[in-house]
Amino acid sequence: MFPKYLILIFIYFIIIYCGEIKNLKDFLTDVIIDTHGDFKYILMEMVNKTNMNDYKYLIRGSNEFDYHKRLYFNFMQNSVYKFPDVYKNFNFKVLGGGRIAFKGKDIIVYGESGVYGKANHKLTCNLLKKQFPSFNVKDL
C-alpha cells in the first residue's frame, strides 16, 4: 500500500501533465485504510455529475480520527479541495460508517457511525476482499 503523500503527488503529477481528467474514478484508489488495529471507516460514493451511471465506491479509514466526520473532512481537504479542477466533475457522498479491525489474517467489519449511520458492510467487505485477497474478510 502506498503512503498517502505519494498518492497526492501522483494526482498532482497527473494534473500538471495531463490537464483535466475525465475518468478520475479509474485511478482513484478504492480502499485507503490503515493495515493494523481497530479503527473507524467511512464508505463513500463518487458519482460523475454528468452521468449518474458512472460511479465508484470508496473506503477510507484510519486510527488517526476519533470521528467518522473527520475522516470525511480529511478526504475532502486532501483530495477534492486541494485539486478542485480535477474533482469538479464528481460528487462525493458518505453512505455510512463503521469500524474495521485487523486481527491476524482476519479483517472484521462491524458497527456504525453516529453521524452517517451504518455503512453497507457487505459492499465494504467485497471492496476489502479485492484489496486484501490473502485475508479472511467478514462482516459481524
Q: How would you describe each model-predicted region?
A:
Residues 5, 15-140:
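Intrinsic low-complexity, intrinsically disordered or marginally ordered coil/linker segments
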